[in-house]
Amino acid sequence: YGVSDVVDSWGEKAYLPISNELNDFFRTGLTSITSVSVSHGNEKLQNYFSYANTTGKGIIDKNRLSKHNITFRETSVIFNNRLKLDGNVNLMRQVSKNKPTVGGFYMNPLVGLYRFPRGEDLSYYRNNFEVYDESRNLNIQNWHTAYEDFEQNPYWITNRIQSKETRTRVILSLSANFKVNDWLTIQARGNMDYWADKLRQKFYASTATALCGANGRYVEMDYQETQR
């Protein structure tokens, strides 16, 4: 098990101790949330404001998250307490960089990690995940065997397959409640939900051909929707 004369992780029984290369690939994740809120008012008017910031560092290198949330709400009572107005605004912006692939083979660094021969030194491919190709005049992926569509150098995936996802969302709501008399009340409400998603991906040349062409690939996608 784990000798270097095979292309996958299974082989003859090893005679030398080996290190746990998987632990060297992962790191400790960290999530930090900072928030502040302010409220003020009297019997006629109330205001509320809050802001929250979330930052995250994933267990895989290059994975980052940044999120901002703003909430503002105001309620008021006018016309001798007969009309009540309530307005609410929520703003959110989130940026996620190099989000890991969930399951599957493509763009999943775990496939290469678990199939890597245990008798070889993974640190070499960490420090030399790309090598210069004189015929193409550029750096190309370096792996212990001819990389397949579903198995690539995990450090190539984290460094040379880059993505950025951005989401902006705005939620608005407004309600008005008018008391005509003791037995009749009229109410009107309105809502709007808008969001915009953007995706940017870069695949460097020599990434598996199932994902891109020989010279790499650039993906740009925009999506917007409004619901009322």
Where is each model-derived feature located?
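Outer-membrane beta-barrel architecture
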Residues: S35-S39, S50, R73-T75, S173-S175, ...
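Short Pro-Gly-centered flexible turn/kink motifs
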Residues: L30-S32, Q227-R228
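Outer-membrane beta-barrel channels and translocator barrels
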Residues: T31, N42-E43, I78-N81, K179-N181
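Outer-membrane beta-barrel initiation region
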Residues: D8-S9, D24-G29, S35-N42
